Amino acid sequence: CIDDTVTKSGSRLLYQYLLAPLVDIELINNRLEITKFFYDNLSLAETIRKSLGKTADLERCITRINMQRSTPKDLLSIKYTIEIAEKIMADFIVLKGVNLDKNIENIIKPLLGLHPLYEILDESIREDSPNSISEGKIIKLDYHPRVAQLHDLLENGRSKIEQIRD
């Protein structure tokens, strides 16, 4: 089997590589340098493979969000995947310091700047969110005072109406 990838995204990328092989010698050499880097750093490669195996299929999550068919699970999956990506970046830096090969830097560069998104998801989305948006109880009550107020109205609306009537 030629596909020894650990993620759906990796399988799709491999498929694209096989469907449209590189013809530019510089790009071929860049890919060979990346391969050599991981061959020379097998423990890092194995650590990254294990980490990648725990990630969500971000392409699918983002597609569902764009099609307005996402669930809270998609948002949490993105959050967890960002957390894993940050760990992978830290593994690179621990191994090689801040002076990484330009090809490896090009792999890591898209991961930079994701922490603010992680923070928003971590601060706002409940870990115990239901699978459906229509069920509610997705946003943490302490995320914003208005959310807590609306939640209180949903939960205690009848009793508040009764109090007003009395």
Cite the ranges covered by each PLM segment:
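Alpha-helical bundle segments enriched in helix-capping/polar residues
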Residues: 1-166
